[in-house]
Amino acid sequence: MKSLKKQRRIQVIILATVALVLATGLIGYAMRDGINFFRAPSDIIAEPPQPSETFRIGGLVEDGTLVRGQGETVRFSVTDGGASVPVVFTGVLPDLFAENQGMIGTGRYVNGVFEASEILAKHDETYMPKEVMDALKEQGVYQAPES
């Protein structure tokens, strides 16, 4: 009698373990496209990512680099004070997008140019994404907003 109970308990434990491993695998598979790592321009210049890798870049839109091209194509550079990365984006920019303002872009780094598929701009004059703020502090160019 006890051996039957023990055998049933082992079967339940094995089944639960298999279900847990399967669920973890499915969650990881579903999230594979949703995970985008953040990189500062200095990180990109130091170690350029593969052209197939999608990631986020953040920093300040470099002054004097914003050029509107044909149609909705926009070119500009993003800097963290230590390095600058050229960006090309085709689409409608957020209303708050401007030079010397914080931004985060999602896309790929191909042939020395970040090809953005999405651009996010800061919310107001005091907001800056944490990753961008940390990168600017690391470069020594971050200035805290005056209250």
Swiss-Prot record:
Cytoplasmic side: 1-9
Subcellular location(s) of the protein: Cell inner membrane
Superkingdom of source: Bacteria
Pfam families for this protein: CcmE (PF03100)
Membrane-crossing residue ranges in chain numbering: 10-30
Function: Heme chaperone required for the biogenesis of c-type cytochromes. Transiently binds heme delivered by CcmC and transfers the heme to apo-cytochromes in a process facilitated by CcmF and CcmH.
Family assignment from sequence similarity: Belongs to the CcmE/CycJ family.
Protein's UniProt name: Cytochrome c-type biogenesis protein CcmE 1
Organism: Ruegeria pomeroyi (strain ATCC 700808 / DSM 15171 / DSS-3) (Silicibacter pomeroyi)
Taxon lineage: Bacteria, Pseudomonadati, Pseudomonadota, Alphaproteobacteria, Rhodobacterales
